[in-house]
């Protein structure tokens, strides 16, 4: 009986590992899934999913230019200025991204947020070969 229980436990562990690998693969292919994987507090709404579809098309170079118009406090900065750069660097560590803002302070804060995402355990699980070099953040 003991060997059957061990067999079932190993089977369950294997299934859980397979499930985790599938979740990770989805997060590598979709900015929406990336957001949900790396931030368990992120609340995805329909307008976030729609924006993510456009951002995915942008990262696949199906869209060359993308302008985002949404009311304040609807998640533009979180998706476009924080999550998207981290996602792009994970998929292409040699990418060049220029982040601009109306204030240097805001741009620096968003840059630190991107660094925090990229230094996170879950990010490194998705993109183990993507690392930041240089000054660490607190």
Where on the chain are the PLM-derived regions?
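N-terminal accessory segments
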Residues: 1-63
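Short, solvent-exposed loop/edge-beta patches enriched in aromatic
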Residues: 58-64, 90-95
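Walker A/P-loop
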Residues: 61-85
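Alpha-helix boundary/capping segments in eukaryotic regulatory proteins
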Residues: 74-80, 90-96, 101
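Conserved nucleotide-state-sensing and coupling region of NTP-binding domains
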Residues: 100-138
């Amino acid at each position: 009986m003991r060997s059957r229980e061990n067999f079932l436990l190993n089977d369950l562990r294997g299934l859980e590992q397979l499930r985790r690998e599938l979740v990770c693969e989805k997060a590598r292919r979709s900015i929406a899934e990336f957001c949900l994987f790396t931030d368990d507090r992120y609340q995805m709404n329909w307008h976030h999913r729609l924006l993510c579809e456009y951002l995915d098309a942008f990262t696949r170079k199906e869209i060359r230019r993308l302008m985002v118009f949404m009311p304040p406090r609807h998640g533009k900065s979180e998706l476009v200025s924080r999550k998207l750069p981290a996602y792009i660097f994970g998929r292409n560590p040699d990418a060049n991204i220029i982040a601009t803002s109306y204030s240097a302070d805001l741009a620096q804060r968003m840059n630190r947020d991107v660094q925090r995402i990229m230094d996170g355990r879950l990010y490194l699980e998705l993109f183990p070969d993507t690392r930041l070099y240089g000054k660490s953040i607190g």
